[in-house]
């Protein structure tokens, strides 16, 4: 068995909207009926029926512009795949929060934050433009 490789120096058939007339025909090897139709094509086109004209078109082109411009359902696959990976990631995050990460440190408690803020005010941290500049030390409340 001999394997024949493609000759890539020759043009290939491609249906593209930006290149509407490919250099080669879609059907390379014609059947007997297609050869007879190609001979009939050389005569007057008014003698050809609509089906014969469509068959001649299909010998030259695989798809019409309407078929090339037709929308595909590929977006459903893309959205489905994206949702699958987002859901899988959410499951991993939930598993990590439950089994990997420990409890939050005490410094996240509201009471701890309030004590730390009071300590910073007592130390008068950044009194010019920072936290201490917004605290009224005489009234013991935030400036308005």
UniProtKB/Swiss-Prot annotation:
Record's GO cellular component terms: mitochondrial inner membrane; respiratory chain complex IV
Localization per Swiss-Prot or TrEMBL: Mitochondrion inner membrane
Protein name as catalogued: Cytochrome c oxidase subunit 4 isoform 1, mitochondrial
Similarity annotation: Belongs to the cytochrome c oxidase IV family.
Keywords on record: Acetylation, Membrane, Mitochondrion, Mitochondrion inner membrane, Phosphoprotein, Transmembrane, Transmembrane helix
Transmembrane domains' residue ranges: 74-99
Keyword Transcription (UniProt): no
N6-succinyllysine found at: 4, 35
Annotated positions of the Phosphoserine modification: 31, 33
Record has Membrane as a keyword: yes
Membrane topology per record: Single-pass membrane protein
UniProt topological domain (Mitochondrial matrix) ranges: 1-73
SUPFAM superfamilies reported in the protein's UniProt record: Mitochondrial cytochrome c oxidase subunit IV (SSF81406)
CDD domains in UniProt: Cyt_c_Oxidase_IV
Modified residues (N6-acetyllysine): 4, 28, 35, 42
Main location: mitochondrion
Subunit structure and binding partners: Component of the cytochrome c oxidase (complex IV, CIV), a multisubunit enzyme composed of 14 subunits. The complex is composed of a catalytic core of 3 subunits MT-CO1, MT-CO2 and MT-CO3, encoded in the mitochondrial DNA, and 11 supernumerary subunits COX4I, COX5A, COX5B, COX6A, COX6B, COX6C, COX7A, COX7B, COX7C, COX8 and NDUFA4, which are encoded in the nuclear genome.
InterPro entries linked: Cyt_c_oxidase_su4 (IPR013288), Cyt_c_oxidase_su4_fam (IPR004203), Cyt_c_oxidase_su4_sf (IPR036639)
